[in-house]
Curated annotation (Swiss-Prot):
Substrate binds at residues 214, 235-238. This is Fatty acid amide hydrolase 1. It catalyses: N-(5Z,8Z,11Z,14Z-eicosatetraenoyl)-ethanolamine + H2O = ethanolamine + (5Z,8Z,11Z,14Z)-eicosatetraenoate; (9Z)-octadecenamide + H2O = (9Z)-octadecenoate + NH4(+); (5Z,8Z,11Z,14Z,17Z-eicosapentaenoyl) ethanolamine + H2O = (5Z,8Z,11Z,14Z,17Z)-eicosapentaenoate + ethanolamine; N-(9Z-hexadecenoyl) ethanolamine + H2O = (9Z)-hexadecenoate + ethanolamine. It comes from Caenorhabditis elegans. Expressed in the pharynx, some pharyngeal neurons, the posterior intestine and anal depressor muscles. It is an enzyme of class 3 (hydrolase). GO terms for molecular function: amidase activity; fatty acid amide hydrolase activity. Transmembrane segments: none annotated. Catalyzes the hydrolysis of endogenous amidated lipids like anandamide (AEA or N-(5Z,8Z,11Z,14Z-eicosatetraenoyl)-ethanolamine) and eicosapentaneoyl ethanolamide (EPEA or (5Z,8Z,11Z,14Z,17Z-eicosapentaenoyl) ethanolamine), as well as other fatty amides, to their corresponding fatty acids, thereby regulating the signaling functions of these molecules. EPEA promotes dauer formation and may constitute a signal of high nutrient availability. Breakdown of EPEA may promote lifespan extension when nutrient availability is high. The gene is faah-1.
Length: 572
């Protein structure tokens, strides 16, 4: 018996040594690739700088001062050429990149596309598309022919896409010119923005704090003035959290309002909770103009992806003068947000009431159960798909907690969850989230379907059009905090689980009064609350947004509500 135990121990040691040696060699090879990619980015930035410098400084600064509508109109009139617009935004994006490390690649082909559009515009029969020549930034995971989509994995560098995604193809048809790609967290399953290939992207308001994720590069670039309109993706808040952290506006549509054929996913094969593209901009009205044109021409996507229904832009909903019924909440029952986020919702409530809308309390049911269902449906294989990919790569330090959790067998997590629950109930609950077998997975899917019915039933009972709520649990925290507070996505992931359209609009900033309330009133009942409280200290001046959500195919009602809040806050 002892002999077999010794053999078992020796075998385990031998396996560990073999695994460690192989991984060390792998990391050494990947470090060379990562350094090469970073060197290539430096050269790429300099090429973009040379292109930008071809434009007269005064002209460049004037073009850069135009807002989205002004630039679009100047391009339509021919007062600004497409090449001038691209060179101006190469310059602006370089400045933003130097401040935040937001860009992973400048799409140098943008100049060629701009030249072609300018040549076509000279033809007497040519009709300019509605977004002719407007520069467009793209999250790095979106497929652009000839460019990488690594999702922060070193192993995927130098594997460029062979064709544009349907959406990118559509954006080009509308006249938009993709001019750069922006940074993401490794695997996309985090609300920070760091990876071993391109490093950490910082918040334009405070470099010690994160810009959010996973569309963090977009949030940082737009927040720093480097782009007028960009495209992110969102599977748990990846558009909305960066918008909230960086003082920008964006929306995650319901799943089928954009085509998915030929796209990619952070975790393929999760049918009930899937990512969708979503626009991000400095303000809501830019998002509206973008979607009005994209959804006005949605047949382009539907013809190429039969699973994308031809649901056109509904101007009657967006422009309706009928007063809305709005349900609101400032605490979801799972994670109490810090004072500034609650204040932002209450101020938005007053703005909507002043506009004549009815705003009543709404209580989302059973959020603790929802958090379990969300993580179970996203990590439907217990995290093994992402874990297997990470074990073949350099692992980003800010996601090591998730990696450690995925490496622990589910049955061990279940056993450990009971003693953990005695001192840290919420962590104990999340440790029971991952599925053990297909029976539990089927149960989870059934529970999600039942929850959707329950939620919309409550909305219909009160005849609600939209929901108003916090965008997150806190303002932008330091870069290491998202990995320590993985459950901080409850306010956004709920609407991925429901497949609602949901957007974020900036409303206010953290005040000294908010910080005093944080110190004196914010709970410290468990480790997550303690971390959140500490991370929020010193955040005075950081932007705060609110979230608006509505059932599928009612994104125009979401945008209308967001726009009314924006007008009340900014006066324009």
């Amino acid at each position: 018996m002892i002999f077999y135990l010794v053999l078992l121990v020796l075998g385990a040691i031998a396996f560990y040594v073999h695994f460690s040696n192989n991984r060390k060699k792998l990391i050494e090879r990947l470090e060379i690739v990562a350094q090469r990619r970073r060197d290539d980015l430096s050269k790429n930035v300099e090429q973009a700088r040379k292109a930008a410098d071809k434009l007269d400084t005064q002209r460049r600064d004037w073009i850069g001062s135009l807002d989205f509508e002004q630039l679009r109109d100047e391009l339509q009139r021919g007062h600004v050429t497409c090449v001038e617009a691209i060179r101006a935004y190469f310059h602006k994006a370089i400045l933003a990149h130097e401040k935040t490390n937001a860009v992973t690649c400048f799409i140098l082909d943008a100049e060629r596309q701009a030249e072609e559009l300018d040549e076509q515009a000279k033809l007497p029969y040519y009709v300019k598309p509605p977004l002719f020549g407007v520069p467009l930034s793209l999250k790095e995971c979106l497929k652009v022919k000839g460019y990488d989509t690594t999702r922060g994995f070193v192993q995927d560098a130098y594997h460029p896409a062979t064709e544009d995604s349907i959406q990118v193809e559509h954006y080009k048809k509308l006249g938009l010119i993709p001019f750069c790609q922006t940074n993401v967290p490794q695997s996309l399953l985090s609300y920070n923005c760091s990876n071993p290939l391109f490093g950490t992207t910082t918040n334009p308001y405070d470099s010690t704090r994160t810009c959010g994720g996973s569309s963090g590069g977009e949030g940082a670039l737009i927040g720093a003035g480097g782009s007028l309109i960009g495209i992110g993706t969102d599977v748990g808040g990846s558009v909305r959290i960066p918008c909230h952290f960086t003082g920008t506006a964006g929306i995650k549509p319901s799943k089928m309002r954009f085509a998915h054929r030929g796209g990619g996913a952070s975790v393929p094969g999760k049918p009930l909770i899937d990512a969708n593209d979503g626009p991000m901009a400095k303000d809501v009205k830019t998002n509206v103009e973008f979607l009005r044109n994209v959804w006005g021409d949605i047949d382009f996507q539907s013809d190429r992806d039969p699973y994308c229904p031809p649901v056109h832009w509904n101007e009657s909903v967006y422009s309706s003068e009928k007063k809305l019924r709005v349900g609101y909440y400032i605490d979801d029952g799972w994670f109490t947000p810090t004072p500034a986020l609650q204040r932002a919702v209450l101020e938005s409530k007053k703005h909507l009431e002043a506009a004549g809308h009815t705003v009543i309390p709404f209580y989302p049911p059973r959020l603790p159960s929802v958090m379990q269902l969300y993580f179970r449906a996203v990590c439907l294989d217990g995290g093994q798909y992402v874990l297997n990919k990470l074990l073949k790569d350099i692992i980003e330090p800010t996601i090591r907690f998730q990696v450690t959790l995925w490496m622990v067998p589910v049955w061990i997590q279940r056993i450990l969850s009971y003693p953990v629950s005695l001192v840290f109930p919420r962590m104990g609950m999340l440790m029971q989230s991952l599925t053990r077998d297909t029976f539990e997975l089927r149960e989870a899917y059934a529970d999600i379907e039942a929850y959707r019915e329950e939620f919309v039933g409550l909305m219909m009972k009160d005849n609600l059009d939209v929901i108003l709520c916090p965008a997150s649990i806190m303002p932008a925290p330091q870069h290491d905090i998202p990995s320590k507070v993985v459950s901080g996505v409850s306010y956004t992931c709920l609407y991925n689980l429901l497949d609602f359209g949901a957007g974020v609009v900036p409303v206010t900033a953290v005040s000294k009064s908010d910080e005093e309330k944080l110190i004196n009133e914010y709970p410290e009942t468990d480790k997550w609350y303690q971390i959140t409280k500490k991370a929020t200290l010193g955040a005075v001046g950081m932007p705060i947004g609110v979230q608006v959500a509505a059932p599928p195919y009612r994104e125009e009602a979401v945008l209308r509500t967001m726009r009314e809040i924006e007008i009340a806050v900014t006066g324009k």
